């Protein structure tokens, strides 16, 4: 009885290690590809026509900040979210 329990536990342990290694291998390829993916996404979000400051960028007035951002009224002055979505900002 004890031998069969030990064999069962050993088989389960080997199966766990085997599936964990296979899963790690699958996720490893995602990690290798992620820098290239992030670099390509960075190009998508960069805009040559953007003359505004992004979130937490320094500012002196609301018009310095991008859409849906406003200049913080107290020091330190930087762009913060103005709690609007879509085309709500007037």
Swiss-Prot record:
Family (UniProt): Belongs to the neurotoxin 10 (Hwtx-1) family. 39 (Jztx-34) subfamily.
InterPro entries from the UniProt entry: Huwentoxin-1
Tissues in which the UniProt entry reports expression: Expressed by the venom gland.
Extent of the signal sequence: 1-22
Domain free text: The presence of a 'disulfide through disulfide knot' structurally defines this protein as a knottin.
Chief place of localization: secreted
GO MF term (any one): ion channel inhibitor activity
Disulfide-bond pairs as recorded: 52-66, 59-71, 65-79
Propeptide: 23-50, 86-90
Purpose: Gating-modifier toxin that inhibits voltage-gated sodium channel Nav by shifting the threshold for channel activation to more positive potentials. This toxin moderately inhibits human Nav1.7/SCN9A (IC(50)=360 nM) and weakly inhibits hNav1.2/SCN2A (37% inhibition at 1 uM peptide) and hNav1.5/SCN5A (<20% inhibition at 1 uM peptide). Inhibition of Nav1.7 is voltage-dependent, with lower inhibition at more positive test pulses.
GO terms for cellular component: extracellular region
Pfam families: Toxin_12
Modified sites of kind Phenylalanine amide: 85
Protein's UniProt name: Mu-theraphotoxin-Phlo1b
Domain of life: Eukaryota
Places the protein is found: Secreted
Keywords noted in UniProt: Amidation, Cardiotoxin, Disulfide bond, Ion channel impairing toxin, Neurotoxin, Secreted, Signal, Toxin, Voltage-gated sodium channel impairing toxin
